[in-house]
Amino acid sequence: MVATFPSSIRLLEHPGTSVLERQHFISVRMPILAHDGANVPISVEMEHPMEPEHYIRSVAVYVFEDPLVTKGVFSFSPHNGRLSLSFQFRMNAGDHRVFVVAECSRHGKWATSRPVRVAVGGCHMVGAGPGALQEAPARIGPPRLWVPERIRPGEIFEVRVKATHPSRTGLRLLADGRTFVRAGLPVFLQSMEVFYGAHWFRPRLINVFTLTSVLSDDPLFIFPLRADQNGLLRIVFTNHRGQRFEVFREIRMKP
């Protein structure tokens, strides 16, 4: 699968010995064996500067053996303070290699990969063959947001936000166990935006997460944010129909 990547993307499977390689190595934590392909967790971290002149612009997750290759593209900014991300997505049954690509503002794109075996696929409707049924309807509701009660000035704190929204690919797996066909319209969250700042009428856009129909149901996102001012933290999800779901917390720093 390395040949799939353009030569401009440098693949690092180990941290390396140079400062450049250590900074751009992507640490990926996920199960080697995933029993449920509808909910595969992944955590990504990098020991990379997150300063205005040198930071990680984005992280993308791909599985080339899946019918829907792109699992998400996640933009970051220096306001995050460090590079860390956890979420959950869907994969088809079988042996796969998950690729993570990070783009540095100075040094271009870097990648790493991890092997994963999925016991039961989660990219298609329930069942196989012409008689397959769409999964039961899932509820849609407001997201939930958690931040620490006490946040110090300059602290890089953890943000947890959980959506209440289903993901349906609209694909059906045929009886041969290999062929996917379109059997319905996808249902999914299309994006997540993170705003933070003292001015409610013009808040700073910190993150834009471009999401897909292979996200897990009711996904939980965990990522960092640097506390540099008092103000509103607001997270906005938008789904495939243009519906918006918002949640917010007031950030008040305490020494």
Predicted regions located by residue number:
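N-terminal edge beta-strand
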Residues: 9-39, 132-157
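Short edge beta-strand/loop segments characteristic of extracellular beta-sandwich folds
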Residues: 29, 41-50, 158-166, 179-181
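A short beta-turn/strand-edge loop motif at beta-sheet boundaries
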Residues: 49-55, 167-173, 182-187
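Beta-strand signatures of extracellular beta-sandwich domains
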Residues: 58-62, 190-195, 236
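Aromatic sugar-binding surface patches on proteins
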Residues: 77-86, 212-222
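Extracellular Ig-like/FN3 beta-sandwich strand-entry sites
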Residues: 93-97, 156, 228-232
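Short acidic/polar inter-strand loop motif in beta-rich domains
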Residues: 103-112, 238-248
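Low-complexity, Pro/Ser/Thr- and charge-rich linker/hinge segments at domain boundaries
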Residues: 120-142, 254-255
